[in-house]
Amino acid sequence: MEFSVKSGSPEKQRSACIVVGVFEPRRLSPIAEQLDKISDGYISALLRRGELEGKPGQTLLLHHVPNVLSERILLIGCGKERELDERQYKQVIQKTINTLNDTGSMEAVCFLTELHVKGRNNYWKVRQAVETAKETLYSFDQLKTNKSEPRRPLRKMVFNVPTRRELTSGERAIQHGLAIAAGIKAAKDLGNMPPNICNAAYLASQARQLADSYSKNVITRVIGEQQMRELGMNAYLAVGHGSQNESLMSVIEYKGNPSEDARPIVLVGKGLTFDSGGISIKPSEGMDEMKYDMCGAAAVYGVMRMVAELQLPINVIGVLAGCENMPGGRAYRPGDVLTTMSGQTVEVLNTDAEGRLVLCDVLTYVERFEPEAVIDVATLTGACVIALGHHITGLMSNHNPLAHELIGASEQAGDRAWRLPLGDEFQEQLESNFADMANIGGRPGGAITAGCFLSRFTRKYNWAHLDIAGTAWRSGKAKGATGRPVALLSQFLLNRAGFNGEE
């Protein structure tokens, strides 16, 4: 679908459809009032007759409104004006896209971007409208043989801004929104792929294709098991021992700042393409969803695509830590003691706490890049789901400014994260009689003790950990990958690049 931005009066629009908002109770938005005045009270008369209350999700399609050039006007219920927040705004946009497609509109001029959303400017409203529209239209049917093409006649959406001064920021919002939406789609597509197709080799092939598509700024290197052995990445290797699929670490380097002093931001994504739990095997119910245990790597891939598409003037390295955790005669066992790349030893108490074993070696590996900051993204703990549910990502960090940056970016992007503590009292839960540490610390504070484990491998740089176990995918009827936290990390990097969305 094509997006553009313009500044114009609603009565002069010759588009097939104009979209305006109505608040509860039967209150016209300012743009709707203009149309009502031009039409000699035609719209307000319909509302007085009870045709539309203005509740969220309500719609009314008007044809051939007097004195209006557009063929149709779509009225969208926006709820109470004072309660229009970010979440409600996105829901209104989603309803708009679905209704326009259902009614056969091929193009529309949307004035919803002129609604007042507390604390949000036109850039934010246009960008979120683009991202939400793309999210609404997403489907994953690559593997279906009988594809039923959904009815989607909508081809062009124009967002209106109040004055010509906002056109530049509106165009930039569309550019950013499309790049972020493409990154989210890429992450969702990877996440939704079945594990018999999407293994570590598949992740590596996608990383190589990204470098081919953006060869000017991107190079990809793939590190296999032989090189991992030479590097001493024994914890990473142990996790993949039970699988017939080779563990592969894909390193995607984007260089947008040629200065020798420009240190990179490193993103590390957990890429367990299937996690059976290993010898500490998981219950069979819901095990199919363990294909989503690579959503951290998928998110990092999506963010790297966004960075390359927008050619941000910063240096970013994305690492996809591809691996598969399976039981078998060669699988690692509870009771094993592993020597990590850092030299620290780990007693394995549970082979289903494998993500941290993969990540700890990758976090040691990335020291060589002398990073400005390192952010790992992982579907790490069920404990984080218990703590924060399926709406908020868990955040831990050894650096307060970095944590504050990420929280701020999460609020800007509408991809929320919440900071959890890292304290010495939690570190004590990882003590082992036989090694430097155990790979689990018991049930209490499980998300935090996982973060504490990782923190022992990040002492040489500023680091943050995003636990996306609750936010990376949905179960039930709407089952599928969400693409989070691509939006959060994209906003963080846009801010670092100087594009913070302020007009």
UniProtKB/Swiss-Prot annotation:
Gene3D superfamilies the UniProt entry points to: Leucine Aminopeptidase, subunit E, domain 1, Zn peptidases
Protein residues bound to Mn(2+) 1: D275, D352, E354
Keyword list, A-Z: Aminopeptidase, Cytoplasm, Hydrolase, Manganese, Metal-binding, Protease
Subcellular location: Cytoplasm
Active site: K282, R356
GO MF term set: aminopeptidase activity; manganese ion binding; metalloaminopeptidase activity
Location (main, coarse): cytoplasm
Pfam families: Peptidase_M17, Peptidase_M17_N
Positions that bind Mn(2+) 2: K270, D275, D293, E354
Family from the record: Belongs to the peptidase M17 family.
Official protein name in the record: Probable cytosol aminopeptidase
Catalytic reaction annotation: Release of an N-terminal amino acid, Xaa-|-Yaa-, in which Xaa is preferably Leu, but may be other amino acids including Pro although not Arg or Lys, and Yaa may be Pro. Amino acid amides and methyl esters are also readily hydrolyzed, but rates on arylamides are exceedingly low; Release of an N-terminal amino acid, preferentially leucine, but not glutamic or aspartic acids
Protein purpose: Presumably involved in the processing and regular turnover of intracellular proteins. Catalyzes the removal of unsubstituted N-terminal amino acids from various peptides.
Cofactor comment text: Binds 2 manganese ions per subunit.
EC number: 3.4.11.1, 3.4.11.10
Cofactors required: Mn(2+)
GO cellular component term of the entry, any: cytoplasm
Gene Ontology terms describing biological process: proteolysis
Superkingdom: Bacteria
